[in-house]
Amino acid sequence: MRCFKATIAYDGAYFLGYAKQPNKLGVQDKIEDALNALGIKSVVIAAGRTDKGVHANNQVLSFHAPKHWNAAKLFYYLAPKLAPHIVLKKLEEKNFHARFDAQKRAYRYLLTKNLKTPFLAPYIACGDYGSLDALNTALKQFTGKHDFSMFKKEGGATTNPKRTIFNAFAYKTFIIGHECVVFKIIGDAFLRSSVRLIIQACVQYSLEKITLAEIQAQIHNLKATIRTPIMANGLYLHRVYY
């Protein structure tokens, strides 16, 4: 068997998350079904398991295929079976583990105050976010190594809630005629819905609905003020570092 590394992008609006689902509406279901149609039976491992509605620009996968498959041939037959909602960007033969070999994951979140067309609604979140300075003040609280037990939803297989965030900041830009705030958070790994809970906390602070002290109390697992993640549609798994 040969091990392959695949880099894909997908539209999370069409899936119930990355992981396999009973109704087969997970990204993993679609990819494994496409491989099965080519006679390849393999579990597909992802660098990160995104939630329902979350997108990916550069998700990384690892899987195995029989030796008669090379990267060029497999790309040719696999890419059309994944389209249009999953795009196979790159495929190479590489002996590695997509999840355990990853060193860092980078997420981006797109948020605008005024969405001018419904056609962008699945891809840019809409809502007030206060001031950019306040957002960045809140984001700085999360850098470093922390126990994120109070910044995760129930579920997930991990038993270690400690994660390191290397960088977290926000900036403004224009995306398809919309002024947006883009949040960028880079960490070694993330717990379930952790990124969206972090961004929700920062937005609520910027809107003066919670204080920095309340954010710090939740980071230190003293009291949970933010329990509901921000909407999923603005979130993208942007890059995985190896």
Curated annotation (Swiss-Prot):
Disulphide-bonded residues: none
Keyword Acyltransferase: no
UniProt keyword rRNA-binding, yes or no: no
Annotated coiled-coil segments of the chain: none
NCBIfam families, A to Z: hisT_truA (TIGR00071)
Subunit structure: Homodimer.
Protein name listed in UniProt: tRNA pseudouridine synthase A
Organism from which the protein derives: Helicobacter pylori (strain ATCC 700392 / 26695)
Gene: truA
